[in-house]
Amino acid sequence: FLPLILRKIVTAL
């Protein structure tokens, strides 16, 4: 998993 995608998921929370 890329950090960019992971951060986007965290921001969606």
Swiss-Prot record:
In the record, Leucine amide modifications are located at L13
Q: Which domain of life is it from?
A: Eukaryota
Q: What is the effect of changing K8W?
A: In crabrolin-minus; decrease in antimicrobial activity
Q: Which GO terms describe its molecular function?
A: toxin activity
Tissues with expression = Expressed by the venom gland.
Q: Enumerate the UniProt keywords alphabetically.
A: Amidation, Antibiotic, Antimicrobial, Chemotaxis, G-protein coupled receptor impairing toxin, Immunity, Innate immunity, Mast cell degranulation, Membrane, Secreted, Target cell membrane, Target membrane, Toxin
Subcellular location(s): the record lists:
Secreted; Target cell membrane
Q: Which function does this protein serve?
A: Antimicrobial and mast cell degranulating peptide. Shows low antimicrobial activity towards some Gram-negative bacteria (E.coli MIC=300 ug/ml, S.typhimurium MIC=300 ug/ml) and all Gram-positive bacteria tested (B.subtilis MIC=300 ug/ml, S.aureus MIC=300 ug/ml, E.faecalis MIC=150 ug/ml, and E.faecium MIC=75 ug/ml). May act by permeabilizing membranes, since it permeabilizes liposomes composed by phosphatidylethanolamine(PE)/phosphatidylglycerol(PG) and cardiolipin(CL)/phosphatidylglycerol(PG), which mimic the membranes of Gram-negative and Gram-positive bacteria, respectively.
- Which family does the entry's similarity section mention? Belongs to the MCD family. Crabrolin subfamily.
Q: Output this protein's name.
A: Crabrolin
